[in-house]
């Protein structure tokens, strides 16, 4: 018998996406998906450039739809109250919440886990890296590096702008001697990409046990032996120093970790930070510079930013 999950759909402004994501990550959320209508308009005009999105979102005229998934439990309704309260409080923080609508539905686990798979096809995420779902065929081209993925319930299919920018940065900076830390690994896609690009050793960390399990499975699918995966909160479980440290989460997390990141990077080590909405680019750049980082490059894709920096 299929299990049922609770799906919380939240309709807010594009400006509020990052804040709402932060609210959700303070609960026992098992999975989050985000669709921005600005992205949807682009996808309607460029139907060949994307792999999956929910056509029901076309009914949303503006803003973004954030879907969060929870197991049925006694604590869920406490979380729901917390979510609604904090979304309503966004205006007091100077953030336009848009509609601020919260809708709750029950979804079948099989529908959630497998219904999207027919839309998820092999996808070129960088110049070399190609993301291939396990169940799809792909004919390798010269110099292709194929990453086999079954994201399951973990965040990280490789199609999001922030993931693609991180992969392109890894393609540019990973060297054979590189030791790479992937903080908030999700499905493990960035850790696997780093390993396949030739990194000597990779450490991946995630707070979500579902993500840790997903990452371990995906690592095994790719027959990789040099990735260590830890269950922990952000920098917990990380030891030693990295040549490259990548975080693809949200701006607030990056802002809170910038000073600590320095302790885990070698001299002139590379910090790849993404998950940053474009409106907060300058805030993150200033914070990095104030903490002794030199900005190497800033890349933008849609409403998202990836910043590559190094210790001065």
Curated annotation (Swiss-Prot):
It catalyses: L-lysyl-[protein] + 3 S-adenosyl-L-methionine = N(6),N(6),N(6)-trimethyl-L-lysyl-[protein] + 3 S-adenosyl-L-homocysteine + 3 H(+). The keyword S-adenosyl-L-methionine applies. Pfam families: PrmA. It comes from the Bacteria. The keyword Glycosyltransferase does not apply. Transmembrane segments: none annotated. Its EC number is 2.1.1.-. One of its GO terms (cellular component) is cytoplasm. Methylates ribosomal protein L11. This is Ribosomal protein L11 methyltransferase. It comes from Clostridium kluyveri (strain ATCC 8527 / DSM 555 / NBRC 12016 / NCIMB 10680 / K1).
């Amino acid at each position: 018998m299929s299990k049922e999950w609770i799906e919380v759909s939240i309709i807010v402004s594009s400006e509020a996406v990052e804040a709402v994501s932060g609210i959700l990550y303070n609960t026992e959320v098992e999975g989050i998906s985000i669709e921005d209508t600005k992205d949807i308009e682009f996808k309607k005009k460029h139907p060949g450039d994307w792999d999956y999105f929910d056509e029901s979102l076309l009914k949303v005229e503006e803003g973004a739809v954030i879907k969060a998934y929870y197991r049925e439990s006694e604590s869920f309704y406490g979380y729901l109250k917390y979510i609604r309260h904090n979304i309503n409080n966004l205006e007091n923080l100077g953030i336009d919440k848009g509609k601020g609508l919260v809708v709750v539905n029950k979804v079948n686990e099989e529908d959630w886990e497998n219904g999207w798979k027919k839309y998820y096809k092999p996808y070129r995420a960088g110049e070399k890296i190609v993301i291939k779902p396990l169940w799809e065929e792909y004919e390798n081209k010269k110099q292709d590096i194929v990453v086999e993925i079954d994201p399951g319930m973990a965040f990280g299919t490789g199609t999001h702008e922030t993931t693609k920018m991180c992969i392109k940065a890894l393609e540019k900076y990973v060297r054979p001697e590189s030791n790479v830390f992937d903080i908030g690994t999700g499905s493990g896609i960035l850790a696997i990409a780093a390993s396949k690009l030739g990194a000597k050793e990779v450490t991946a960390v995630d707070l979500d046990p579902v993500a840790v399990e997903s990452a371990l499975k995906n690592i095994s699918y790719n027959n990789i032996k040099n990735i260590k995966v830890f269950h922990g909160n952000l920098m917990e479980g990380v030891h030693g120093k990295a040549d490259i440290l990548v975080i693809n989460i949200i701006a607030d997390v990056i802002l809170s970790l910038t000073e600590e990141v320095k302790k885990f990077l070698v001299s002139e080590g590379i910090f790849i930070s993404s998950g940053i909405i474009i409106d907060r680019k300058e805030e993150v750049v200033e914070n990095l510079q104030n903490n002794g980082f030199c900005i190497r490059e800033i890349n933008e894709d849609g409403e998202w930013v990836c910043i590559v920096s190094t210790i001065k």
